[in-house]
Amino acid sequence: MAPDSGSFPEGPPLKLLPVDTRDRGTQRCRLGPTALRALGAHLGSAVKISLPDGGSCLCTAWPRRDGADGFVQLDPQCTSPGSAVGAPGSGGIINLNRLRLVPCPPLRSLAVWPELREQAGASGAPSPAAVLEAVQELLRNRPVSQGYVVAAPPGAPGPVAALHIVSGAPSPNPAGLVTPRTHISLSEVPPSEEEPQPEVPLGGLSEAADSLRELLRLPLRYPRALASLGLEVPRGVLLAGPPGVGKTQLVRAVARETGAELLAVSAPALQGARPGETEENVRRIFKRARELASRRPTLLFLDEVDALCPRRGGPHQAPESRVVAQVLTLLDGIGEDREVVVVGSTNRPDALDPALRRPGRFDREVVIGTPTLRQRKAILQVITSKMPISGQVDLNLLAEMTVGYVGADLTALCREAAMQALLHSEKNQDNPTIDETDFLEAFKKIQPSSFRSVIGVTDIKPVGWEQIGGLEDVKLKLKQSIEWPLKFPREFVRMGLTQPKGVLLYGPPGCAKTTLVRALATSCRCSFVSVSGADLFSPFVGDSEKILSQVFRQARANTPAIVFLDEIDSILGSRSISRTECNVQDRVLSVLLNELDGVGLKTIERRGSKSDQHGKCKQLEKNEELEFQEIFNSNVIVVAATNRPDVLDDALLRPGRLDKIIYIPPPDEKGRLSILKVCTKNTPMGPDVSLEKVAAETCFFSGADLGNLCKEAALLALQENGLEVTTVKQEHFLESLKTVKPSLSHKDLTLYKNLFQKKEFSILEDI
């Protein structure tokens, strides 16, 4: 039989058709050629299918007679107790990721509990020999699984109606094949009334599950073969990833799938108050794991292991050092027992003692990053599978809108949407339905957990490009630099272009530099972090650099993201050869340069697939294209604004860092007219108002000055005509021009023009 290949990630849906009458009682599953190739199945391979009702079915793979793709027909002769024994209803949908190949080795022995038919006119119960003969005939050359029920074909002769598989298949194997050499015995004790829990699909964790499954199956399933080959397999596995990605759920699911005994322990719960109590608790847990391993393979799971084994070396860490030494000793001794695998999980791998991460202890590390677009869609499919979702809800759109959300965040989002649906459906409380408006309301309350402690996260008011008057050339350059790479990554890859690392906006005050960045964040639909000097600077040495690194680390977890450094000249310093001391601004500048260069990117910050997606852009379908788009845009874009670019360090302005430098000029007459129209959009204007004349009279006015001019004109109208005034007249604008003076001057513009013409700023783009 084929080896267990794991669940197929994100497969196409298959329509469930009624079973062919010729296949009744054969335990066959008819699939199209595309599905067979995707599963890697051969003729007669054992396939485990998760049914829509929550149960599962065990059958053998066979090609469809008509060779059609997109359909599945199965004979549910061997199913879990929670499933219907009869044929499933037609018209259902089963995704390909619900089908999984399972190993099916020959069984040496098998114990079953027969369920007998009620035969009319029978003088007594059938003899055990007759029942055993019927059982052998029913199970001949069929795959079975422990805990499943095998139903007799309709109309089949014999006293047996169904068989409950009590024991037989080895625990690591989900299934086993009944052969003529299999010794079948009849159990006198009926199976437990407790139904096994249905298998829960691991949405978005298929890649990590495959890695962990491979590490666990080798020592648990083939210990003697590995010992004879002299191979040392990993005895410890460390799961690393941010909180809420599903590390604990992954371990429980893989342990259930491999048939291993799971001993789950929360590491903080082992801490004791008395000296030596923690070490005693740790020894007791490892002893319990060895006792369980004497009966079946055991998986010891230490959750939040960083709380138990922190980094040693501090002056007041003697108790922690003793605990770490005890854990190291026990991990070294666990290698003698090949039936125990230790798995630790943490969201702070750097806080672990380095001695735990050497070969022989936690020598394998599986990193579970923040879910990508495809993984978020898979998680949403699992969460909403049992929720009354309206047909108008687009999971693809929800996956696009949930950048930076982990599995726990998505669960909270769906739960909040269900609460909103319950509140809105007062008239139909018996059958509430969740629609897209409920999810939009939930978005206002549930934000990514990785952004809840980020410095500089602001709830910006959406600003459209049309709300900014003038500056059409500047808008186009910003779209080309930032928006186009985010929305059209295939075209950039095809032309060999890369996304800019940073953009610098400079110009006189009040010329809409900050407003342009807000409009950019609104149009790109990406995460937005605004950082100021008040957020960064701290009286403690090294704290400012640490805060800036934390901002970039958490922004990378929510990419695509824009980090906005407003008034960057007040945050960063300019290094000089003559100055030998290094102040805090120089150290912050050094951290920013390293972040822009990509130095110090940690493994735990990985997102998306390990495979290189850049060479596959031409063959991508829609979902794969969205996945490629997210992986391509996995960097953080830095947008800085200043009105003093002359004080910035030259190293910050070279290509590869702030490599796109855009000058934001004051508005010309056409731009001033556009700004006046935007500012007076909601103001009732009199018929005598000529905005063209006002624009001609406002030379050297910035955008902020024009907005202030419109406000002053409206206030003058209220002062002169009282609160009953309905319009603003031309005379109010002319009167306001006498009090509102321009903030710019010819000297200021000449200064910027001379600055632009300097040699070191020859790369600046005059607009």
UniProtKB/Swiss-Prot annotation:
Q: What does this protein do?
A: ATP-dependent chaperone part of the 55LCC heterohexameric ATPase complex which is chromatin-associated and promotes replisome proteostasis to maintain replication fork progression and genome stability. Required for replication fork progression, sister chromatid cohesion, and chromosome stability. The ATPase activity is specifically enhanced by replication fork DNA and is coupled to cysteine protease-dependent cleavage of replisome substrates in response to replication fork damage.
Q: Where does ATP 1 bind?
A: 241-248
Q: Which domain of life is it from?
A: Eukaryota
Q: Which PROSITE patterns match?
A: AAA (PS00674)
Instruction: Give me the reactions it catalyses.
Output: ATP + H2O = ADP + phosphate + H(+)
**Annotated GO biological process:** autophagosome maturation; mitotic spindle disassembly; proteasome-mediated ubiquitin-dependent protein catabolic process; retrograde protein transport, ER to cytosol; ribosomal large subunit biogenesis
PANTHER family from the UniProt entry? AAA-FAMILY ATPASE, ATPASE FAMILY GENE 2 PROTEIN HOMOLOG B
Name the record gives this protein: ATPase family gene 2 protein homolog B
Q: Give the originating organism.
A: Bos taurus (Bovine)
SUPFAM superfamilies per record: P-loop containing nucleoside triphosphate hydrolases (SSF52540)
Q: Which SMART domains match?
A: AAA
Q: Where in the cell is it found?
A: Cytoplasm; Cytoplasm, Cytoskeleton, Spindle; Nucleus
Free-text activity regulation comment from the record: In the context of 55LCC heterohexameric ATPase complex, the ATPase activity is stimulated by DNA binding and inhibited in presence of RNA.
Which Gene Ontology cellular component terms are annotated?
A: cytoplasm; cytosol; nucleus; spindle; VCP-NPL4-UFD1 AAA ATPase complex
UniProt record similarity statement: Belongs to the AAA ATPase family. AFG2 subfamily.
Among the Pfam families in the record, one is AAA_lid_3
Gene3D superfamilies recorded? 1.10.8.60, P-loop containing nucleotide triphosphate hydrolases
Q: Name one GO molecular function term.
A: ATP binding
* Residue positions, PTM N-acetylmethionine: 1
